[in-house]
Each structure stands twice: as C-alpha cells, then as structure tokens.
Amino acid sequence: MRNSYPQILEAKAGNQKLVAILLDPDKLDLAGIGVLVAKINESPATHILVGGSSFEGSHLDEIILSLKQKTTLPILLFPGNPSQITAEADGILFLQLLSGRNPDYLIEHQIDAVPVLEKTNLEIISTGYILIESGSETAVERVTKTKPLDRNNFDYVAQTAKAGELIGNKLIYLEAGSGAQQAVPLAMIKAVAERISVPLIVGGGIRSKTGINEAFNAGADMVVIGTAFENDSAFFENDWSKSQIPNP
C-alpha cells in the first residue's frame, strides 16, 4: 500500500498543488475503463478518488483492481457509506460531515465502518467534510438529509473547518457537490486556508483550467474534478500537462 498523507503534507510544505479525479463507481464501465485510465494517466492527476453518495458497493473490489492494473496513481476511497469500503484500495478519506447534524454522518457510519477497516491495511485519513451551498440541491444533501452551509458566511465556515482540525481531522474538504451550479467561493477558500494548518481539498462545480487555477491561488492544496471529467474524458487534453500544475 502507498501512503498518501505524508506525500500530501510534503506537497503542501513545498507549495506543490495536487489534482484528484473523482470516479463514481455507479457510472464506470469496466469494459471501457482502460481508455478512461489512459486519459487520467495523461492528465495532471496526482490521485484518484473512488466513491459516490448512493453507490452500494457492488463490484467495488473488481473496479479498484482494474484501476490498479492500469495506473500507478494512489487510489483513495471516498465513501458515502460503509458499504463502499474495500481492502483493495490504497487508502480511504474517512469522512466526518461537519456541515450537517445528522448523527449517521457525524459518527454512526464511522462506528459501523470500524469492523471492516480493522480487517484491512488501508491508510485511514480522517477528513472533515464540509458541504457548501451551491445553487441547487446536490446528491450529498439528498442522501445525508442535511443542509449545506451558507456560501456567504465565510467566517462560520472557517470556524467549522478549524473545529474539524482541532478535533483531529488530517484534511479539510470543502465540497460544493457533484454537478454543482456554483463552485466554492474563492474568498471562502482563502478564509479557510488562512484559518487551518492541515491541507485543504476543494471540489464541486469546477469546470475549467481557470477554475482550478483560481482555487489553487485562493489556497486549495488539492482540487477534485469529478463531473467535468465524467462528462468529458478529454477535459485535460491540450490544456495541461503534469509539469504545468501551478505553484502560486
């Protein structure tokens, strides 16, 4: 297994920006996964996240093994529930939904996951997950039955992120949601980045190289691209190479 967290810390210390591609298992075609992974390997991606809000875990082992046969990038689980855990991945973002007050996503699912995790060698990276209002209801809202935080209340979001860090989370993830109409505000990214000392991940609603660069410049250490790549696997072509990931 490859440990990602030390690499993420090293990248943050060296101001090296990271890009993760989020793959929804419900939408993956195993027959065409080779072509998809080839696109990822040619992109600026440094990590692959696998998971979705409603996926029930069927064939997840097969999906991860197929990915690992075709890429050397670290593969981290991004689980919506404990059924989305497999020992075949390299690690897991062990999520705590800090923006909501549904006990299932604050602690219950984490407790349920313990017997499964104890049987694996997964690198477990505790992650404070904060859903931000994005202009429309997202799958995360529907599944978790929680409301996102106000996209204009930068100080409260920054306080929430800091609380997540003080609780012990190793990463903070600001999420606008899959297919979000609006990305996380740049001023909010800046406010959170200035308040916390752990690495900051930002995802949802980012649809262009400009959007990625703006998030980096605002303080994101890792940007997650999901729907944009899902809708267009040529998203990065003729646009970026791995050597062009910015160092603001």
What residue spans do the PLM features occupy?
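N-terminal amphipathic alpha-helix/helix-capping segment at the start of soluble metabolic enzymes
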Residues: 1-23, 113-127, 133
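Active-site mouth loops of central-metabolism enzymes
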Residues: 17-33, 79-81, 131-157, 202, ...
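Hydrophobic faces of well-ordered beta-strands that scaffold small-molecule active sites
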Residues: 19-23, 48-50, 75-77, 92-94, ...
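Active-site beta->alpha loop and helix N-cap motifs at the rims of alpha/beta catalytic domains
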Residues: 23, 27-37, 47-52, 70, ...
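Glycine-rich phosphate-binding active-site loops on the catalytic face of alpha/beta enzymes
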Residues: 49-55, 91, 95-106, 174-179, ...
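Alpha-helix-loop-beta-strand connector modules within alpha/beta enzyme cores
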Residues: 60-83, 113-120, 125, 182-208, ...
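Conserved anion-binding
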Residues: 84-165
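Glycine/Thr-rich beta-alpha phosphate-binding loop at enzyme active sites
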Residues: 142-188, 230-237
